[in-house]
């Protein structure tokens, strides 16, 4: 791919413009390769949010929209780079190259493997601009390359998670390449293997399908679950540690990190309550994905509302709780009189349902509240079966 000076100038001058409007003005700019310009402008706009350290570099090339939307964000790529170390790295599913770029910065040599020629051309162009001259780009199929490659310290791969009809998958065996089928070969080629998976995949099923998982990292960014990472190694471990991470992206919160094992979850003591106290807690998205419900109640001085509610309460604020904390203002049932007394002054609220016999939409219709504002309303069930609406504000 080549970009002419005229097109490069157009990209710089219009990098914040609406690409749909630009597409309609193509005839006004006969010397500009408009399809390429639109792809690059759209890429820069996504990068401004997703890869901020790259977005100000004029010479970075971006792929078509679909590939960019599927790639990692900078914050998750940086986190992954803290988990691997060694001299040599091979990325078998290169893609746009964000993960490879941040991982390779920690290695003396790296190989990027990608079967799409256009993505390889983009990666080969971008890596030197990022001062990553030690990455060797290979335009090959990842599985074929794996079979013939020499051993390295670490392998990274991000299997495709779409089925033949474009639907989302829940099992590793439905992904391409099939890591379960390749597990022994992968570990013959590297002492450590990192597999990046969609958070939509079933973690319990993944741990049954793979025999050599040592650690699991569930990564959220601003409380949105983004990635499921499995670290495979040749040495066996008695218990698989599960790391639940919530990363800040706006610089306004601290990283939250909680580690547990499935064995600890089964054995942890959990106190339940029939009465709300002063504060309410909602675990972050990584904890909810991991199922660390009893472990959280055991690790922090909080009580669980109900075995299936996944909400917690305490008398004194627990500032270190890995999730969102709220100050409880009031509580009520769905009784009309109680609703009026507790919520009568509200016009809008953020509503969450946890173990409650109504959807958010049904509740909004019944209590006539629009979305938004500073008030949070949790509809849940206490341990004695009592249904409650809990009015809160952020602690």
Language model: regions and residue ranges:
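SAM-dependent transferase fold signal centered on methyltransferase-like domains
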Residues: 1-395
């Amino acid at each position: 791919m080549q970009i002419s000076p005229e097109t490069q100038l157009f990209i710089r001058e219009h990098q914040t413009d609406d690409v749909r409007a630009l597409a309609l003005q193509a005839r006004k700019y006969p010397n500009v390769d408009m399809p390429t310009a639109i792809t690059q402008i759209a890429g820069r706009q996504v990068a401004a949010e997703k890869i901020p350290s790259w977005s100000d570099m004029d010479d970075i090339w971006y792929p078509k929209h679909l590939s960019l939307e599927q790639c990692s964000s900078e914050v998750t790529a940086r986190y992954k780079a803290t988990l691997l170390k060694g001299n040599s790295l091979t990325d078998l599913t290169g893609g746009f190259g964000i993960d490879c770029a941040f991982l390779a910065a920690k290695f003396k040599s790296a190989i990027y493997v990608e079967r799409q020629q256009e993505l390889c051309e983009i990666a080969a162009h971008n890596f030197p601009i990022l001062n990553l001259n030690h990455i060797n780009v290979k335009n090959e199929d990842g599985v074929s390359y794996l079979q013939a490659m020499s051993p390295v310290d670490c392998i990274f791969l991000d299997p495709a998670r779409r089925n033949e009809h474009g639907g989302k998958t829940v099992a590793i065996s439905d992904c391409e390449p099939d890591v379960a089928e390749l597990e022994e070969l992968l570990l013959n080629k590297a002492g450590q293997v990192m597999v990046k998976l969609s958070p939509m995949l079933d973690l319990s099923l993944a741990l049954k399908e793979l025999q050599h998982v040592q650690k699991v990292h569930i990564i959220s960014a601003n409380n949105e679950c983004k990635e499921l990472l499995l670290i495979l190694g040749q040495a066996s471990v008695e218990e698989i540690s599960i790391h639940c991470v919530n990363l800040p992206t706006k610089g306004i919160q601290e990283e939250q990190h909680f580690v547990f094992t499935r064995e600890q979850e089964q054995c942890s003591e959990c106190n339940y309550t029939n009465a709300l106290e002063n504060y309410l807690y909602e675990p972050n998205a990584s904890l909810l994905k991991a199922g660390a419900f009893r472990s959280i109640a055991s690790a922090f001085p909080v009580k669980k509302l109900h075995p299936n509610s996944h909400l917690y309460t305490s008398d004194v604020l627990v500032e270190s709780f890995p999730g969102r904390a709220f100050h409880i203002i009031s509580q009520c049932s769905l009784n009309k009189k109680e609703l009026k007394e507790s919520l009568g002054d509200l016009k809008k609220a953020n509503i969450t349902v946890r173990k409650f016999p109504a959807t958010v939409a049904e509740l909004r219709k019944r209590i006539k509240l629009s979305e938004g504002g500073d008030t949070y309303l949790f509809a849940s069930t206490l341990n004695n079966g009592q249904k409650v609406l809990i009015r809160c504000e952020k602690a």
